Amino acid sequence: MLTLLAILAVSYLIGSIPTGIMAGKMLKGIDIRKFGSGNAGGTNAFRVLGWKTGLTVTLIDIIKGVVAAVSVVAFFRHHPIDVFPDINEVALRLLAGMSAVVGHVFTVFAGFKGGKGVSTAAGMLIGIAPVSMLMVIGIFLLTIYLSRYVSVASMLAAVAFPLIIAIRKYIFELGSGLDYYIKLFGEQLSFHDSLDYHLMIFGLIVALGILYTHRANIRRLLSGTENRVTFGKHS
């Protein structure tokens, strides 16, 4: 039990690193939560700080999710405080990743008011189901390119994930996942692309959560007042 609590606590603290707020303070001396949508995540960083900074914030927030779902779990597997949790591996990684997402949304370092959790959740899923997430990222980027709405891209990508898992698992009959091997700098590396049913259930819950946290964006989209990303105007 102590090991599980440690995994969740460390993952929460990693997720709590307020990337967007730190970028705003360091680059412009502002709290980005007082501008734009009032959010501390990557979407508002794009809007307030420009696309380059917004992209950097988003990538770091993604890395937080990957680290929680992969590295934190792996560390405590090799260095348990007591008995390592007897939990399905994918379910455990999801718990760690979600703890990081909670940290991102309710960051202890910034008054428990952070981002929406999209990028950190994406990072968690990249660590667990990288091939499926490559498809989701493709949908995300294409939607931004065509619509210039980061919020629309985030919501569409969230809905696409459980659908992609279901299609690959049941229509293409890929079972619980596939193992991939790549050669890098003369070394053979392997990674597992999971299609565990826990991912579908989780994906549906996340999609609903993302839609809920974007309800203000949906209202702005319907009223025609949602801001678009314009590439090249900010540095």
From Swiss-Prot:
Membrane topology: Multi-pass membrane protein
Pathway it works in: Lipid metabolism; phospholipid metabolism
Subcellular location(s) of the protein: Cell inner membrane
Matching InterPro entries: G3P_acylTferase_PlsY
Transmembrane segments: 4-24, 56-76, 94-114, 124-144, 152-172, 191-211
Keywords recorded for this protein, A-Z: Cell inner membrane, Cell membrane, Lipid biosynthesis, Lipid metabolism, Membrane, Phospholipid biosynthesis, Phospholipid metabolism, Transferase, Transmembrane, Transmembrane helix
GO aspect biological process, one term: phospholipid biosynthetic process
Keyword DNA damage among record annotations: no
Function, in words: Catalyzes the transfer of an acyl group from acyl-phosphate (acyl-PO(4)) to glycerol-3-phosphate (G3P) to form lysophosphatidic acid (LPA). This enzyme utilizes acyl-phosphate as fatty acyl donor, but not acyl-CoA or acyl-ACP.
Family statement drawn from the similarity comment of this UniProt entry: Belongs to the PlsY family.
Quaternary structure annotation from Swiss-Prot or TrEMBL: Probably interacts with PlsX.
Name this protein carries in UniProt: Glycerol-3-phosphate acyltransferase
Organism: Chlorobium limicola (strain DSM 245 / NBRC 103803 / 6330)
Phylogenetic classification of the source organism: Bacteria, Pseudomonadati, Chlorobiota, Chlorobiia, Chlorobiales
